[in-house]
């Protein structure tokens, strides 16, 4: 059946309250917050829900909803200016799951590595193929930071090497490393759900026997690896620099991403005391910092 969507604009101070009101008082089936100014929000504080200064609110209703009643309820809430602007749209019914699936295609990284959704045919059966379905929380290769790390791993000789994926998320980098020849990969993440996702995706790719996953507090003492990759954010890369450097063997390699071009030189400065840093690689304002630890 078709749906009705009502679009409002709010500030970050009252957007969540308005969203709650739409759900509780007007019968909205779902409420979505969008950035009205295309301004990214990075690195919220622990426990903080960050929204944009200018936020669009999209509320979805079934086709029979009384839009006059909904607008009257919004006015009565006094959460918006008296003459607030709004837009009512009718959305056609679609096979949303199929449309969502059609947006994802196999992606190639470097010369031989493919990330492919399970419902798509593998373009090159003889290439290195990682089967990974898009999820809500963790990387699938579409973000520049993940792509930068995948390209770096693909360029390395990982045969027989031990690799640490620091902040493993979906396990995409860990699984790619195994498929590219790594003997053993250790995934570390602060989120237990990430560890479950990594193990599940490794099972689907037939490489679970080569992947170990740990919360930071449970990782083995003295853990080090030939290759370390950390796709997290600039703040943690700075704060955890001593820990991350300590995971890299002498003459071992490290790659980091999740860093904007304006942050890259500063983040790199935290690692130059122990690593020879390669030229920084940029893609769509995001950067990869890589280097080799001094022997």
UniProtKB/Swiss-Prot annotation:
The keyword Lyase does not apply. It is an enzyme of class 2 (transferase). GO terms for molecular function: protein-lysine N-methyltransferase activity. One of its GO terms (biological process) is methylation. SUPFAM superfamilies: S-adenosyl-L-methionine-dependent methyltransferases. One of its GO terms (cellular component) is cytosol. Its EC number is 2.1.1.-. S-adenosyl-L-methionine binds at residues 146, 167, 189, 231. The keyword NAD does not apply. Pfam families: PrmA. It is found in: Cytoplasm. It catalyses: L-lysyl-[protein] + 3 S-adenosyl-L-methionine = N(6),N(6),N(6)-trimethyl-L-lysyl-[protein] + 3 S-adenosyl-L-homocysteine + 3 H(+). Keywords: Cytoplasm, Methyltransferase, S-adenosyl-L-methionine, Transferase. Methylates ribosomal protein L11. Belongs to the methyltransferase superfamily. PrmA family. PANTHER family: ELECTRON TRANSFER FLAVOPROTEIN BETA SUBUNIT LYSINE METHYLTRANSFERASE. This is Ribosomal protein L11 methyltransferase. It comes from Vibrio parahaemolyticus serotype O3:K6 (strain RIMD 2210633).
């Amino acid at each position: 059946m078709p749906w009705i969507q009502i679009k409002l604009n709010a500030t970050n101070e009252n957007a969540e309250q308005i969203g709650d009101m739409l759900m509780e008082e007007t019968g909205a089936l779902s409420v979505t917050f969008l950035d009205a100014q295309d301004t990214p929000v990075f690195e919220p504080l622990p426990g903080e829900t960050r929204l944009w200064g200018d936020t669009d609110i999209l509320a979805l209703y079934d086709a029979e909803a009384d839009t006059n009643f909904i607008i009257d309820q919004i006015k009565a809430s006094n959460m918006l200016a008296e003459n607030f602007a709004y837009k009512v749209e009718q959305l056609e019914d679609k096979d949303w799951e199929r449309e969502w699936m059609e947006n994802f295609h196999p992606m190639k990284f470097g010369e031989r590595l493919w990330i492919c959704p399970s419902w798509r045919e593998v373009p090159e059966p003889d290439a290195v193929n990682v089967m990974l379905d898009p999820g809500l929380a963790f990387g699938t290769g579409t973000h520049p930071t993940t792509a930068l790390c995948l390209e770096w791993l693909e360029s390395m000789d990982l045969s027989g090497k031990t690799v640490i994926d620091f902040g493993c998320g979906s396990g995409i980098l860990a699984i790619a490393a195994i498929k590219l020849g790594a003997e053993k990969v250790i995934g570390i993440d602060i989120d237990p759900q990430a560890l479950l996702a990594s193990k599940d995706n490794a099972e689907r790719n037939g490489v679970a026997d080569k992947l170990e996953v740990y919360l930071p507090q449970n990782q083995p003492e003295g853990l080090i690896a030939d290759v370390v990759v950390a796709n997290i954010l600039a703040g943690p890369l700075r704060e955890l620099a001593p820990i991350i450097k300590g995971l890299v063997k002498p003459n071992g390699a490290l790659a980091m991403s999740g860093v904007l071009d304006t942050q890259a030189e500063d983040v790199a400065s935290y690692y130059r005391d122990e690593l020879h840093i390669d030229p920084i690689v940029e893609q769509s304002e995001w950067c990869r910092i890589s280097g080799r630890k001094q022997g």
